[in-house]
Every structure is written in structure tokens, then in C-alpha cells.
Amino acid sequence: MVKSEMKLVIFSLFLLLIGVESLKNGYPVIEGGGSPDYGESAECGSEDSNSADNFCNDICTNVGGKSGDCCLGSCFCFDLPDEQKTVEVMDRTKEYCEFVE
């Protein structure tokens, strides 16, 4: 009896883990963003990197992300919800932007 109850508990925990929503990082697709390098992501980049990072942080939180920074001329967001579309980029680019956060 104890083994079957333990199996049920483990199975229940497994189902809970499957249902957990994961978050992703990337360049969010923004209608009308028009960055020449990253499709429809929000373009940033100015002489003042603090204002570019603040701009990107605002963009990213508006689309449901935790935060964002200007990376390689476009806004790169952290902890975006799964339903947010992101621009397809090489893994190396994504890893770079995650590293320099």
C-alpha cells in the first residue's frame, strides 16, 4: 500500500512540474519596431547607453518580461512569457546578450 501511495505522490509532482510555465529570453517581436538587424524587434542605441537601457527595460516590461537591455542595437528581454513571439537569432548572439546583462 505504501509503494502505491508513493508512486501516486511522485506522479502528482511530475504532473505539476510539467504544467509550470517556463520563461524565455530574446528579442521580442514588436509591431513597427523595424530594427534592420533583428526584424521586428525594438531598435535601441544612442550615445547615452543608460537611456537606451531604460528604453529597452520599458519595452520589455510592457510585453511581460522581467527586464531588458540594449544589446547589439536592439532590445533584448529577460524572462518573457512563452506566448511572446521572439525574433529567431543564432544561439551565440543570445548567449552573448545573456552574458553581458
Curated annotation (Swiss-Prot):
Record's keyword annotation contains Manganese: no
Coiled coil: none
Homology family: Belongs to the long (4 C-C) scorpion toxin superfamily. Sodium channel inhibitor family. Beta subfamily.
Signal peptide interval: 1-20
Domain remark from Swiss-Prot or TrEMBL: Has the structural arrangement of an alpha-helix connected to antiparallel beta-sheets by disulfide bonds (CS-alpha/beta).
Tissue: Expressed by the venom gland.
Cross-referenced InterPro entries: LCN-type_CS_alpha_beta_dom (IPR044062), Scorpion_toxin-like_sf (IPR036574), Scorpion_toxinL/defensin (IPR002061)
Key words, A-Z: Disulfide bond, Ion channel impairing toxin, Neurotoxin, Secreted, Signal, Toxin, Voltage-gated sodium channel impairing toxin
Database matches in Gene3D superfamilies: Knottin, scorpion toxin-like
Function: Excitatory insect beta-toxins induce a spastic paralysis. They bind voltage-independently at site-4 of sodium channels (Nav) and shift the voltage of activation toward more negative potentials thereby affecting sodium channel activation and promoting spontaneous and repetitive firing.
SUPFAM superfamilies noted in UniProt: Scorpion toxin-like (SSF57095)
MF terms in GO: sodium channel inhibitor activity; toxin activity
Disulphide connectivity of cysteines: 44-70, 56-75, 60-77, 71-97
Listed name of the protein: Toxin Tpa8
Species of origin: Tityus pachyurus (Colombian scorpion)
Domain spans labelled LCN-type CS-alpha/beta: 24-98
Location(s), subcellular: Secreted
Main location: secreted
Family annotation (CDD domains): neurotoxins_LC_scorpion
Family annotation (PROSITE patterns): LCN_CSAB (PS51863)
Superkingdom as given in the UniProt entry: Eukaryota
